[in-house]
Amino acid sequence: MSKSSKLCCKTSCPRSNIFCSLVDKVFKRPSLQSLHQWGYHCYEPRVYRTLAKILRYVDLEGFDILLSDYIAFVEKSGCHLEVNFNLEFTEICVNTILYWVFARKGNPDFVELLLKKTKDYVQDRSFNLALIWRTFTPVYCPSPLSGITPLLYVAQTRQSNILKILLQYGILERENNPINIVLTILLYPSRVRIMVDHELVDIEEDAKTCLVLCSRVLSTISIREIEMQLSLGRRPIISNWLDYIPSTRYKDPCELLHLCRITIRAQLLTNNMLPNGIFSLLIPVCLQNYLNLES
């Protein structure tokens, strides 16, 4: 099966790269021949429908191809496309990809593949290929300008299996103010039950797991900030939330073993080697797992 047939299912693609093909379709529309007529309202529906048709049914192999096509497109498009159109088009593509991966599929395997394919770009938050830092709209709308990052969305929905992957890749450690993620996990209103594999998830239990995972990354968690929010009338999703934050994160001295984990992970993060670099260290497997936040 060719690359285009794997990606497009029943829709044939005239070019090997799905994003180049989309641009060609946009250019061929008579209403878009003049630059002054370009804008989200003109071509966003077509881009979204095309990518949604792919992402709705795509498997991991097809998603790998789609990400490879997007990376190749972004790396070359800047030289060939009008600047504003290029920015708008890539924003629509990123918004659609993140929406389907995080809000619709919620599949850890897809999230990990996305991180693997784009980890080399994650240090530049402004780059279109640093997908994990881009914003998207969880309830899909054309413009992602008022959206949220994948990490914040996962914290809001308490998807602990996906949060663990993001943390293993050092995404929380790269946050400027990681306590905001803890506050979101604990205090964000739970409006819906999350479906995973057609089963209802216990959000409270997932929230507990999320707090434990964050405690494996952070050296301190400000209880004062949490209590300040509670004093303003906000309600925690977990009544006994303090039981899930080790006392060594807010009161007692931090464990030496945990401080070593933080230091080693920070060095690996600086060299963009999380999490794979952990498993090249000549240490026992149990310590590798500890560094990888398994315990």
UniProtKB/Swiss-Prot annotation:
Cross-referenced PANTHER family: ANKYRIN REPEAT AND SOCS BOX PROTEIN 17 (PTHR20966:SF2)
InterPro entries according to UniProt: Ankyrin_rpt-contain_sf, ASB17, SOCS_box
Protein name as annotated: Ankyrin repeat and SOCS box protein 17
The SOCS box domain, residue ranges: 232-295
Comment text on domains: The SOCS box domain mediates the interaction with the Elongin BC complex, an adapter module in different E3 ubiquitin-protein ligase complexes.
Entry's family note: Belongs to the ankyrin SOCS box (ASB) family.
Cleaved signal peptide residues: none
Swiss-Prot/TrEMBL ANK repeat ranges: 146-176
Organism for this UniProt entry: Bos taurus (Bovine)
Keywords: ANK repeat, Ubl conjugation pathway
Protein's GO biological process: protein ubiquitination
Pathway: Protein modification; protein ubiquitination
Pfam families, per the entry: SOCS_box
Physiological role: May be a substrate-recognition component of a SCF-like ECS (Elongin-Cullin-SOCS-box protein) E3 ubiquitin-protein ligase complex which mediates the ubiquitination and subsequent proteasomal degradation of target proteins.
